[in-house]
Amino acid sequence: VNGAECEPYLTSDYRRMLEEPEKVIGGLKIMLHMFPRAKGVICIEDNKPDCIAKFRELVLPEDNIEVLELKTKYPQGAERMLIYAATGRKVNSSMLPADAGCIVDNIDTVTAIYQAVRFGEPLMSRIVTVTGDAVQNPCNFEVPVGMLLSELLEQAGGLKNEASKIICGGPMMGKALF
C-alpha cells in the first residue's frame, strides 16, 4: 500500500491514514484474502510518525501485514521505487509490478475496496487537497468524482489573489491546467 504521498503540499492520503486507518487495513485484508500466500506491506514515509505508530499498533495482531517506514525523499512514492524499497526487487521500465510479484495500490484505492466489498458502496468521491498562496482557505475536501474546479475553489473560499498557475495533482508530477 503506497502511503508515501511524496508530492509536496498534498496531504489527502495523510489525513485518510490518520482518520480512517481501519478502512485502509480492511481494504488490504480483502486484497490479501484473494492472494492467501501474499504479504501486505503498508509503506509510509518517516515524516508521518503519527501514521506509522497508529498503523503499527493496528496491524500488530496480523501475521501477514507489516508497516515499512521509508525515508522521506522524492520520488519515494513512485511505483518502481516503492517496490524496490519494500522488496529489494528491481522493476525496469518494460516491466509491470506483477512481473516482480507485486500489486501497488494507493491509500484511496484500498479504502475504496473496503467500502465496496464491506458496504457495497461504489467509488463516488475522493479526497483532494486544495492549497497554495492564492487559496483563501487551504484544506482537504471529500468531493464527488467529476466536481468542477470552480466549485472546488469556491468550497475553499475562493482565491485571495490571482493564481499564476493551477495544477491538478502534485507540483512534481501533476498537470498544469494553466
Regions found by a protein language model. Name each.
Residues 12-18, 34-37, 43:
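Metallocofactor- and cofactor-centric catalytic cores in central/energy metabolism, strongly enriched
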Residues 14-22, 46-47, 146:
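Cofactor-cradling patches in redox/metallo enzymes
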Residues 166:
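Major-groove recognition helix of helix-turn-helix-like DNA-binding domains
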Residues 6-7, 30-34, 41-45:
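Short connector loops at secondary-structure junctions
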Residues 1-13, 134:
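Gly-rich Lys/Arg/Thr-decorated short loops/hinges at beta-loop-alpha junctions or inter-strand turns
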Residues 175-178:
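A structural-propensity feature for long, helix-poor, extended segments
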Residues 18-34:
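Histidine-anchored nucleotide/phosphate-binding helix
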Residues 41-149, 155-162, 170-171:
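Hydrophobic alpha-helical positions that pack around
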